[in-house]
Amino acid sequence: MEARAKVMKALAHPTRLFIVDELSRGERCVCELTEKIGADVSTVSKHLSLLKGAGIVLDDKRGVQVFYRLRVPCILNFFGCVEAVLEETSRQPVAIGE
């Protein structure tokens, strides 16, 4: 259960979700992600480090640049499941405390 929680925790941030979504289109260097996110390199690197530690992404250093890609593309299936939950919830709001 703790390993699952680690993966879920790594995905539990809007910036990291954006990174995973961006990597679904192919590998990206840190510089590209930094530009798209609008954050400094150290912040983006920290997010990538958490994703790597959870086994979600792999890195490949080429010269001075580091490129990242999804380790297991099926992680995107989780996004579809989240969308289904949100869609269902929007139809029938859940009362707090249920």
Predicted regions and their residues:
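Beta-hairpin "wing" of winged helix-turn-helix
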Residues: 52-62, 69
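Amphipathic alpha-helical dimerization/coiled-coil segments
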Residues: 1-3, 75-98
